[in-house]
Amino acid sequence: MYADDKQIYVDTTLDKDDVNNACQRLHDCTADVSAWCASRRLQLNETKTELAWFGKPSRLEKLAAMNHTVTVGSSVIEPKDVVRDLGVMLDSGLSMKQHVAKTASTCFYQLRRLRQVRHLVGQELTTQLVHAFVLSRIDYGNSTLAGLPKSTIAPLQRVQNAAARLIMNLRIRDHVTPALRQLHWLPVHHRVNFKLCTMMHAIHTGQCPAYLSDTVQAVADNPTRAGLRSADTAAYRKPKCNTAIGQRAFSFAGPLAWNALPSALHDIADRRQFRKRLKTHYLSLN
C-alpha cells in the first residue's frame, strides 16, 4: 500500500479471517499515519493512496473473489493490478512487464525528440542528451529487474540499441554491437548486475545503511561445514530459495552477482576504482 512515498506491507494467508485482519491492520496503520501528519500540520493525500495484493496468480484470484477494500479517511481504496512506487510500476505478479513496457515507451519518445535535432548537434552533445533523457531511465530502479528473463528486459535492450544508432548515425540495418563497444556501454542485463554488485560493495566496505546490510550474510561470519573452504573469502551466503520470484530478491540476487566476480575485485576498497574495474570486467564478457 502506498501513500506518496510511505509504504505499508502486511502478510496474510488466504484464510478469510486473516485477510479481514490484514485489511483492518492496514486501516489502523493509515489512520495512525494520517493522525501523525495532522498533528504536524501535514495532510495525507488520500487520492494518491493505492492498494495491491502480491502473490501467485492462483492466490490472487482467490483474494479478488473476496472483494476486500481498505478505507483511508473518507476514501475507499480498491486493489489494483499495478501500482507505482517511487516511479517503479509494480504488478501483482511482480513480473515487471508493465514497468519495462512503460520505460521503453518513454525512452523511445525521448529518442524521437532527439532524432529531430540530431543534425544540429555533434556526437558528444548527443551522447550527453541520451545519457540524461534515455539511459538514466533505463538505469533507474533497475535492481528490481534482477533475475528476470532476457525476453522480459528485451525492450530496454532495443532502446539502448536505438540510442547507440542515434549517437553513431547508424542505419537501422547496421550492426549495433561495434557501436555499443565503442561507446563502452554495458548490455542491460549487465547493467542490472552492475547495480547489484555496487550495492554489495557498499555492504562489504561498510558504506551502506543497516536495512540493506542486514539482508545478506558473509560466509566468513558463520561458516558451515560445506563452506569452510570459502570462509576466508569475501563470499556472501545465498539463502535457500526454491522459487524463481524468491531468487529475484536482493538477499539472493546480490550475493549471486557478487560471488561470481573475480576475487581481485572483492579486494578493492575504493568505490570509484571498484566501479571502474567492475565495468571493465563486464565489458570483457561481451
Q: Which residues make up each language-model segment?
A:
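Hydrophobic/basic alpha-helical segments
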Residues: 1-286
